[in-house]
């Protein structure tokens, strides 16, 4: 391959410049939002901005301040002023170098972050080429697995496709934007070394059948027989082919030599990677189980392994969540994508080292999870919620195309969306004391045509917490699950919804609709506030819980995921890095509700004066 473009072509000059401009615009916007630096307006209308850096370089650009406080930066307006010269901006790493002193980035951290940024730009070049001729309407019509190939990625992380550990050939083979398929590599693993957890109605044969047809199952069993593997002593584990080549073949060589792990080869249906890289979907059977597999690469702030500590409780916890959803009328729009099985094989030595870097303890495991397609009736389809703000080459977002196709107005369509997504997530918190980190990858919107009618949620191992209070509703959750999951104060669970869903998904959705459709963001958040207030009015029995989990406070936490990387660098650690906190944000729900109330009061006064 000569480069990442279709047919293996190298990156072209003009597209490279455009990709870099977009990356600089994103860095300026998100790092200013995180208070890593402070651009200043140059005019009273706050349309032209200036960023002065400690290096002596100044950047100027056009931008619009949004309701969350971030700036929507126009990439084509960016200019760099240095040594009396004004030049257009077309180098994202050069911007990072200019800002390094201001951002307090050490030289080692700068170089490694630049590696992540270059990898991201390479992936973005591929995405831009693949998406060039597709309108927002075209994108909206694609099946979810195909659409995920064409998305920009994490909206808050400029280096969202860092994938440290992969080269161009690995990107081409395993990254979603390249459109390739993956066949699972299989190991036979000694049962006395492997932790297996199954839902009550799930057997090992059904797990095999979700990834292999009958012919492939027979081939795999023949390979086991040839290797002398007994199913009495060993179980079959799928692994990501890169993980076998890049990590397991060497790091677990002693287990292979002892016969506790037996490599069998690649078998089964073709799978495609989703946005998270680790989760793979079956291309032949959309309703077949997805598999989540460790890939020991650094991507979007963390090593992408699969921890073993939640493996034993995954099927039980997700089954309990699904039961709550089935029997609670307020949760009817919600479907839990159950983790029907999990297996984990600990490393014989790393596992026993106190405070060992976490990536060495998460190398070999698998989670089998339901596909969103398994829950769908005719005419309904899934769409990753993070796809809604995605824009086409003209700047039109997918959400605009869906609203136009639905025949509904903006407010009515958004009311349907919030009723399908925000209300069930909030109800789970208030009724059951469960808080989900509901970011754009973990939440799947269910569409009936172009209208939101439901939501599917996933990833409960580390992305769901329980309230630290004695909610009676939690007593039906088995004790060993309650002891394993983290217990958090109400404010922390509330932050999961405010940060994971509102500030990480809705912030960009309202920005896209304001930017392209001209929808006032106060209308957007007044619609959300109105839908949540209607839900609260329907459940007066939860009034004390609503006070405990108050979404309408004037201020909300500001979470910073980028500046924490600049501060801590890339050294090994026993746990994943935690985000940093900035000054509190003005809560858009409070802003919108207050503005709506003020307008209603003004209308009432005017009406009274006219009588």
Predicted regions located by residue number:
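An amphipathic, hydrophobic-aromatic interaction surface with interspersed Lys/Arg
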Residues: 419-431
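A short glycine-rich, hydrophobically flanked beta-strand micro-motif that places a catalytic Asp/Glu
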Residues: 432-446
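Nucleotide/phosphate-binding site architecture used for ATP/NTP-dependent chemistry
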Residues: 1-420, 447-611
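Intrinsically disordered, low-complexity segments enriched in polar/charged residues with Gly/Pro
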Residues: 266, 430-433
């Amino acid at each position: 391959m000569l480069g990442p473009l279709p047919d293996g072509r190298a990156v072209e000059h003009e597209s490279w410049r455009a990709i870099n401009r977009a990356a600089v615009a994103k860095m300026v916007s998100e790092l200013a939002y995180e208070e890593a630096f402070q651009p200043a307006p140059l005019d009273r209308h706050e349309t032209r901005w200036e960023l002065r850096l400690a290096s002596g370089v100044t950047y100027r650009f056009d931008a619009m301040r949004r309701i969350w406080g971030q700036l929507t930066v126009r990439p084509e307006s960016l200019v760099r002023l240095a040594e009396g010269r004004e030049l257009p901006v077309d180098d994202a790493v050069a911007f990072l170098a200019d800002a390094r002193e201001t951002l307090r980035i050490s030289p080692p951290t700068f170089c490694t972050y630049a590696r992540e940024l270059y990898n991201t730009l390479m992936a973005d070049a591929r995405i831009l080429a693949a998406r060039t001729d597709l309108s927002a309407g075209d994108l909206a019509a694609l099946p979810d697995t195909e659409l995920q190939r064409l998305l920009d990625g994490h909206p808050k992380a400029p280096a969202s496709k860092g994938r440290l550990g992969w080269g161009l050939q690995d990107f081409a083979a395993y990254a979603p934007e390249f459109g390739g398929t993956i066949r699972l590599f299989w190991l036979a693993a000694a049962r006395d070394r492997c932790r297996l957890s199954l839902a009550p109605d799930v057997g090992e044969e059904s797990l095999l059948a979700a990834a292999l047809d009958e012919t492939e199952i027979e081939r795999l069993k023949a390979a086991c027989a040839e290797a002398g593997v007994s199913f009495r002593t060993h179980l079959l584990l799928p692994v990501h082919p890169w993980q076998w080549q890049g990590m397991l073949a060497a790091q677990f060589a002693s287990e292979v030599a002892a016969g506790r792990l037996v490599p069998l080869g690649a078998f089964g249906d073709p799978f495609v990677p989703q946005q998270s890289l680790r989760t793979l979907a079956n291309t032949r059977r959309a309703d077949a189980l997805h598999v989540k597999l460790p890939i020991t690469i650094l991507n979007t702030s963390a090593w992408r392994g699969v921890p073993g500590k939640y493996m034993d409780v995954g099927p039980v916890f997700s089954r309990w969540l699904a039961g709550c959803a089935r029997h609670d009328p307020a949760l009817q729009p919600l479907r839990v994508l159950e983790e029907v099985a999990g297996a984990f094989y600990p490393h014989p030595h790393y596992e026993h080292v106190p405070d060992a870097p976490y990536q060495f303890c998460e190398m070999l495991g698998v989670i089998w999870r339901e596909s969103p397609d398994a829950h769908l009736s005719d005419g309904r389809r899934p769409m990753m919620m993070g796809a809604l703000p995605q824009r086409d080459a003209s700047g039109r977002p997918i959400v605009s195309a869906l609203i136009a196709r639905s025949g509904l107005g903006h407010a009515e369509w958004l009311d349907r969306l919030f009723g399908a997504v925000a209300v069930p997530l909030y109800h789970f918190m208030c009724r059951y004391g469960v808080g989900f980190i509901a970011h754009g990858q973990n939440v799947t919107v269910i569409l009936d045509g172009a209208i939101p009618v439901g939501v599917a949620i996933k990833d409960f191992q580390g992305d769901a917490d329980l309230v630290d209070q004695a909610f009676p509703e939690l007593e039906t959750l088995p004790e060993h699950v309650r002891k394993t999951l983290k217990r958090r104060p109400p404010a922390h669970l509330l932050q999961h919804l405010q940060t994971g869903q509102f500030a990480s998904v809705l912030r960009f959705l309202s920005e896209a609709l304001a930017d392209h459709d001209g929808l006032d963001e106060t209308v957007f958040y007044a619609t959300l506030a109105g839908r949540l207030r209607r839900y609260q009015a329907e459940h007066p029995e939860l009034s004390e819980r609503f006070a405990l989990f108050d979404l309408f406070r004037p201020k909300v936490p500001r979470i910073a995921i980028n500046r924490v990387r600049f501060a801590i660098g890339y050294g090994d650690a026993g746990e994943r890095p935690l985000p940093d906190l900035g000054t509190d944000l003005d809560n858009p729900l409070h802003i919108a509700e207050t503005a709506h109330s003020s307008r209603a009061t003004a209308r009432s006064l005017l009406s009274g004066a006219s009588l």
